[in-house]
């Protein structure tokens, strides 16, 4: 099946999800105004209360979908508490959606270090200065922390904070949705079976 076919209604014939996702993300990168890799990340807290926020997908392969964060943040703590999460991409310009659910793994230190090294210097300083999700008394307090860490790491490399790393959602299900007239949408879900292979099914819209 050609990449063109993968991005039309024929996507329902795709045999596995990752090549299809790559084709759709490529389309979104060309079509969306910005942040085609922006994704809604859903977690639950210790009381089972759901939470959701936008993050940026920073990598994917057959092993899963990777994003990075402060592990001391609300989302970091919620994920560490359950080691499960869900994602939803919605590309409005393409009228497409992809939903991903599964257990979560922590990326290796080597993988986190490699990505951290690609971030702008200001973003690496920010990873140290921001006590993410905790109360902030004023903007000045944040800017002061940024200035302090900028001075501390004025020379040489900025090390990655131990509390800053990446998570990988290992998908159990990946669902593709494409808008059709009269809400008669196309939906296809891939589910990983006990052998690690993908079972595919169409769903009613």
Swiss-Prot record:
Gene3D superfamilies named in the record: Electron Transport, Fmn-binding Protein, Chain A
InterPro entries xrefs: Pyridox_Oxase, Pyridox_Oxase_CS, Pyridox_Oxase_N, Pyridoxamine_oxidase_dimer_C, Split_barrel_FMN-bd
Alphabetical keyword list: Flavoprotein, FMN, Oxidoreductase, Pyridoxine biosynthesis
A GO biological-process term: pyridoxine biosynthetic process
Entry binding sites for substrate: 58, 115, 119, 123, 183-185
Role: Catalyzes the oxidation of either pyridoxine 5'-phosphate (PNP) or pyridoxamine 5'-phosphate (PMP) into pyridoxal 5'-phosphate (PLP).
UniProt enzyme class: oxidoreductase
Keyword presence, Heme: no
PROSITE patterns given in the database record: PYRIDOX_OXIDASE
Cofactor(s) of this protein: FMN
EC annotation from Swiss-Prot or TrEMBL: 1.4.3.5
Residues involved in FMN binding: 53-58, 68-69, 75, 97, 132-133, 177, 187
Reactions this protein catalyses: pyridoxamine 5'-phosphate + O2 + H2O = pyridoxal 5'-phosphate + H2O2 + NH4(+); pyridoxine 5'-phosphate + O2 = pyridoxal 5'-phosphate + H2O2
Protein origin, superkingdom: Bacteria
Manner of cofactor binding, per the entry note: Binds 1 FMN per subunit.
Sequence similarity: Belongs to the pyridoxamine 5'-phosphate oxidase family.
GO molecular function terms listed in the Swiss-Prot or TrEMBL record: FMN binding; pyridoxamine phosphate oxidase activity
Annotated pathway: Cofactor metabolism; pyridoxal 5'-phosphate salvage; pyridoxal 5'-phosphate from pyridoxamine 5'-phosphate: step 1/1; Cofactor metabolism; pyridoxal 5'-phosphate salvage; pyridoxal 5'-phosphate from pyridoxine 5'-phosphate: step 1/1
Protein name: Pyridoxine/pyridoxamine 5'-phosphate oxidase
Subunit structure: Homodimer.
One Pfam entry name: PNPOx_N
Protein source organism: Mesorhizobium japonicum (strain LMG 29417 / CECT 9101 / MAFF 303099)
HAMAP family reported in the protein's UniProt record: PdxH (MF_01629)
